[in-house]
Regions:
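Short, intrinsically disordered low-complexity segments
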Residues: 1-3, 17, 52, 180
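Intrinsic structural disorder
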Residues: 1-2, 45-46, 168
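Short, Lys/Arg-enriched N-terminal segments with co-localized hydrophobic residues
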Residues: 2-10
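Glycine-/small-residue-enriched capping loops at alpha/beta junctions
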Residues: 11-118
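Phosphate/ribose-phosphate-bearing ligand recognition and processing surfaces
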Residues: 96-193
């Protein structure tokens, strides 16, 4: 891990500098895609989804409505509306009004990465999916999402950068600590489930 001097920590290791953890506003990311912590009905209500709707405009919700419900653990892609990001990938880690499970988080993260790669995207930014309204534990979220990102980068992919954009210093610290633990594991086990 290396501090670039601009408040962003850059991870350097076997997956080089392709996973980055930072504090900030996900909706301001100038990446090919940002990920929405979505419910399976793709209703942009509160939390991250609400912020995306407010900044990205109603077009994103209209596109979600046209897609309709998707299974928990899957993801869907829409335009970025008025956001800097070209696309929003909606990771359905819970049912509307429900909670997030480890399995749903793992699958929706992996599916989001696959959708980005299928579209040939170079950069994607994730929030801490499921830790807000859905009540999933931040530490477990960090472990699952970082492992999925590392696993994805081990295969051939168009993705060059995977950002984890956390809303405060505490969340960022949890993700940084999780990443250090994962990287300290013996070779071949760092991306095991």
């Amino acid at each position: 891990m290396r501090d670039r001097g601009d408040g962003e920590l850059q991870m350097t290791n076997s997956i080089e500098d392709r996973i980055l953890i930072q504090e900030g506003d996900l909706t301001e990311m100038d990446t090919d895609a940002i990920v929405n912590a979505a419910n399976n009905d793709l209703i942009l209500g509160g939390g991250v989804a609400g912020a995306i709707r407010r900044k990205g405009g109603d077009q994103i919700q209209r596109e979600c409505t046209a897609i309709g419900s998707i299974p928990v653990g899957y993801a869907a892609i829409t335009s970025g509306g008025q956001l800097k990001a070209r696309f929003v990938i909606h990771a359905a880690s819970m049912a509307l009004g429900g909670t997030t499970t480890a399995e749903a988080l793992r699958h929706s993260t992996g599916h989001s990465l696959r959708i980005a790669a299928e579209r040939g995207l170079k950069s994607i930014a994730f929030p801490a999916v499921g830790t807000g309204i859905a009540g999933f534990a931040m530490k477990e979220c960090a472990e699952i999402m970082l492992r999925e990102a590392a696993r994805h980068l081990r295969d051939e992919t168009s993705l060059e950068k995977i950002y984890f954009v956390l809303f405060d210093e505490h969340a960022r610290s949890i993700f940084e600590q999780a990443w250090k633990r994962i990287q300290a594991e013996p070779a071949g086990t760092a991306t095991s489930a």
